[in-house]
From Swiss-Prot:
InterPro entries: DnaJ_domain, HscB, HscB_C_sf, HscB_oligo_C, J_dom_sf. HAMAP family: HscB. Disulfide bonds: none annotated. This is Co-chaperone protein HscB homolog. GO terms for cellular component: iron-sulfur cluster transfer complex. Residues 5-77 form the J domain. The gene is hscB. Co-chaperone involved in the maturation of iron-sulfur cluster-containing proteins. Seems to help targeting proteins to be folded toward HscA. The keyword Kinase does not apply. It comes from the Bacteria. PROSITE patterns: DNAJ_2. GO terms for biological process: [2Fe-2S] cluster assembly; protein complex oligomerization; protein folding.
Amino acid sequence: MGTPCHYALFDLQPSFRLDLDKLATRYRELAREVHPDRFADASEREQRIALEKSAALNDAYQTLRSAPRRARYLLAISGHEVPQEVTVHDPDFLLQQMQWREELEELQDEADLDGVGVFKKRLKAAQDTLNEDFAGCWDAPGERDKAERLMRRMQFLDKLAQEVRQLEERLDD
């Protein structure tokens, strides 16, 4: 049994631009249908299949709702598999990374919750710009190398956003 395309599970065409609210609604509908508890009285085989379907659905949803994971997945299903551990070779972006990290470290040292909020807004704007850039080059034939570079940047910003949320939680306690 092959793994169905994540998009096909949700009756969607592969695209970077998604309506995340509709995706979440469809996920909840499908999750109710395949939830393992619904198969408590079924045969062991049917229970296992329900569990596998539920796990596949959860994985597909987590992938599609995350812009960097969705970008990586699109590249993979288009035959442009991206190794997990390749670094970004863009000096300007590397410098920007260092500046963001230093700024975040200063905000942590100063326990500046308001500053973290401002940083978070700037980071979100940078993520939105990257997402739009990726969507634009994804729609343009022959731009897969650029799409890969943008996806790597998206992954970095996503990781940085997670660190910002964690810092925000620590400072908010």
